[in-house]
Amino acid sequence: MTAALEPIILEAARSYRLPVALIHALIKAESNFVPWAVSPKGAMGLMQLMPGTATFLGVTDPFCPRQNILAGCRYFRLLLDFFCDSIPLALAAYNAGYQRVIDAGHRIPPIKETQEFVTQVLERFYASIKRGRRQISL
C-alpha cells in the first residue's frame, strides 16, 4: 500500500462509516493495491468495480484511486445496509453479486471463489484489529 492512498481511505472510512482495516483488507484482496488492475471479468481499479457498478455509482475514471475507493466503499456500505450490517454477507455480495447472496438464502453462496474471498478479507481484517490498527467503528 502506498501512503498516498491513506487520506482517501480515511475519507471513505469516515464518509461511509467503515473500519479502515476493512477497507485495507478489501483493497488488498481485490487488487493488491494496484490502481490499474483489471480482472478477467472486467472489474477495474483498486476496489475492482464492475463497469455497470461503476456507472451506477457515477465513476467516470475507475482507475482514479479517489473515485474508485470512494465508490467501492459507498457500494460496500449499501451492501452492509442491505444485509443488516453483516460483514460476511456484504463481502460475499461484493464478490459474487447481491442476488447470489439472496438466492443462497442470505448466506454466503456455495461458490469457492466467493467463500475464499470472504475468508481472506475477514482474516486480514481481524489480524489487523489484533495488531491494533486504527479503527472507525461501524
Regions found by a protein language model. Give the residues of each.
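Catalytic glycan-binding domains that act on GlcNAc-containing polysaccharides
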Residues: M1-L138
